[in-house]
Amino acid sequence: MDRRGLLTGLSALGVVACSRPGPSAAASAVPEAFDLSALEARDGGRLGFVAHDLGSGRELVWRGEERFVYCSTFKMFLAAATLLRVQAGEERLERMIPVAATDMVPHAPVTGPAVGGALSVEALMQATVEVSDNPAANLLLAAMGGLEPMRAFYRGLGDADTRVDRFEPEMNRLDGDKDTTRPLNGAANLKRLLVDADTPLSDAHKALLLRWMIETPTGPARIRAGVPAGWTVAHKTGTGGYGPTNDIGVLYPPAGAPVILAAYHHGARETPPARNEAVIAEATRLALSELGRA
């Protein structure tokens, strides 16, 4: 689909249009404590959670200031940073980047078959957002000059807390505060890029990023499992092999303003992955019920 067709299609869903909130929705929310301790106790993990209703302005928060390893949720922000480079004339969507055997790290569903050839910048972004391809993320980081430009990207959003310390897959390994964020930062960054009227992303590039986030097949048992039928979910998952199970995104109802949601669950190492995912789904259901959006 071309850029114009993509933008038209997302507008028809109400995704682009309802990403332009009125003054009341754009106002700063006052965080409300949203006690999820019972949910944590049931599965023995630690959950950081934010649900921001852009219609009412209510923002439900649990452990919003605590740090969590973000894992692959960062990849949608990496794509956004790359799109801003395209807008600035520093990068081109169609530029081909060689893919070598030495670039390979675990989880390479798109780049693995491309070894010895090349993929476009756009294809690498799509791969890293839709199917969380790790070499694609590293190639995009290298293309922008390493980790410092990503740090600058977050600072440009007003986020001085999110850490960017390592490449894939090392960034998924718990090591103090390295490669961590706070749930309130994750939610605020989503709002700044995908909802605010003065987002730095152009309409076409925002629509492109949203399409990848909507079409991703990852994490169907996380946020998606907790929303009512008929809602559109644009999200990005992140998973560590020792318990971290994350999902962040924007939830678009059939009518009305969207809800921003950021969930970072650090489950116990021995907890089955399905149970860790169910925690996020249940927290989503509880939040939407509390907000009167269920």
Language model features by range: what are they?
Residues 22-69:
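Beta-lactamase-like hydrolase cores
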Residues 57, 69-97, 261:
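Active-site SXXK
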Residues 138-197:
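Mid-domain, small-residue-enriched loop/turn segments at the edges of structured enzyme/sensor domains
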Residues 104-139, 147:
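Conserved catalytic neighborhood of penicillin-recognizing serine enzymes
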